[in-house]
């Protein structure tokens, strides 16, 4: 099982403003940055409750018919989602990954600040793709939290785009 992160941040490392707003991230869909290819490579998404609630406010469900697993111990309401494949799970990251692997999933897209941090701390992330937006927002929700130990990364590739975005891919090696 491979667990990957594909996320955008401000240059100062924030994935959202303090109130969760994503207005500093380009959403125009203009210049391709590899997201479509990445998304096509994953079997399912694992997101946290806050990310799920943010996505519910979008005009369209962005995940199509890909299975989405929402991590939450509390009850969630999926009634607004008609054709989406959404389910709820709870538990430690290693347990979630094992359960999904047993169901035949091979590549998970892990998204959402707290969820990414928990999976990284548990050693469940194998690949990180981080696209930095050329803006400093000064405060917000950080991509990375505290870690029990260093996480060594191997640089795979960096691409710079005309828009000023810089996408870097890393393999987690320890």
List each model region and its residues.
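Enzymes that bind and transform nitrogen-containing heteroaromatic metabolites
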Residues: 1-174
């Amino acid at each position: 099982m491979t667990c990957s992160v594909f996320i955008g941040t401000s240059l100062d490392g924030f994935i959202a403003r303090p109130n969760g707003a994503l207005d500093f991230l380009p959403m125009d869909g203009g210049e391709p940055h590899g997201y479509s290819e990445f998304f096509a490579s994953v079997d399912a998404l694992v997101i946290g409750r806050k990310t799920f609630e943010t996505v519910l406010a979008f005009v369209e469900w962005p995940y199509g018919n890909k299975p989405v697993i929402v991590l939450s111990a509390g009850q969630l309401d999926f009634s607004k989602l008609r054709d989406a494949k959404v389910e709820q799970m709870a538990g430690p990251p290693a347990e979630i990954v094992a359960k999904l692997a047993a169901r035949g999933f091979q590549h998970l897209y892990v998204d959402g600040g707290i969820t990414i941090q928990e999976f990284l701390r548990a050693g469940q992330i194998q690949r990180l793709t981080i696209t930095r937006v050329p803006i400093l927002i000064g405060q917000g929700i950080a991509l990375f939290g505290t870690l029990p130990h260093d996480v060594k990364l191997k640089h795979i590739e960096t691409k710079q785009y005309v828009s000023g975005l810089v996408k870097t891919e890393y393999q987690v090696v320890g």
